[in-house]
Regions:
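Hydrophobic Val/Ile/Leu positions in short beta-strands of Rossmann-like dinucleotide-binding domains
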Residues: 1-2
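Glycine-rich Rossmann-fold phosphate-binding loop(s) that bind the pyrophosphate
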Residues: 5-6
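N-terminal Rossmann-fold NAD(P) dinucleotide-binding loop
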Residues: 9-10
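Gly/Ala-rich phosphate-binding loop of Rossmann-like dinucleotide-binding domains
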Residues: 13, 17, 102-103
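Residues at the starts of beta-strands that form the adenosine-phosphate
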Residues: 21-22
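Conserved acidic E/D residue at the C-terminus of a beta-strand in Rossmann-like folds
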Residues: 27
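Rossmann-like adenosine-cofactor binding region
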Residues: 30-125
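Rossmann-like dinucleotide-binding domain for NAD(H)/NADP(H)
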Residues: 81-177
Length: 177
């Protein structure tokens, strides 16, 4: 299952299909509508989405509306043999929900690249030391293509700013260029 219908989730879908996985989608109402328009399989409900997949991978941006959007109830609906994957942001998971869910065996395993406190203190973090968790130190995005995309975007933004024509402004109302 893929939660979120953005660029990264679509790339992950290709990998999943290469391994013979059937992909189901969930996300915002708009994301589900776009996925459906693209002919993707949308879960019949949020509950079914968390209860069905062998692997559930999260690909959502963290913003005030998405903070804590994956709840203890959601995790508790996952199968005991399911893997929960989060390479997006730790804040998408309700505070304090993941460790008890893992201890209860739902989901049965987690693969994490993001943590509540980064850099992670490996020796003292109960999630990092959980026997059913695989961790990487927030390096899941590190690919040649991703570096090229990020640095090209940064270069474009700096060049535009130097020409007094900034792009991708979050608060254009304060620009007095």
């Amino acid at each position: 299952g893929l939660y979120g219908y953005g660029r990264i989730a679509k790339i992950v879908e290709g990998y999943a299909k290469a391994f013979g996985m059937n992909v189901i989608w969930w996300g915002s109402e708009d994301g589900r509508a776009r996925a459906a328009a693209d002919g993707k399989t949308i879960s019949e409900s949020r509950e079914a989405f968390f209860a069905t997949p062998d692997v559930l991978s999260v690909h959502v941006r963290l913003k005030p509306a998405t903070k804590g959007m994956i709840t203890a109830t959601d995790l508790g609906q996952m199968r005991q043999d399911a893997v929960f994957v989060n390479t997006s942001r730790a804040g998408l998971i309700e505070d304090g929900a993941l460790l008890p869910a893992l201890n209860a065996g739902r989901p049965g395993m987690a693969a994490l690249d993001v943590f509540d406190h980064e850099p992670i203190t490996w020796d003292h973090d109960p999630i990092a030391n959980h026997p059913n968790v695989i961790c990487t130190p927030h390096i899941g995005f590190v690919t040649e293509d991703e570096f090229e995309l990020q640095f090209a975007d940064i270069f474009d933004q700096v060049a535009a700013f130097a020409k007094c024509a900034p792009i991708h402004m979050i608060n254009p109302q304060v620009w007095q260029g």
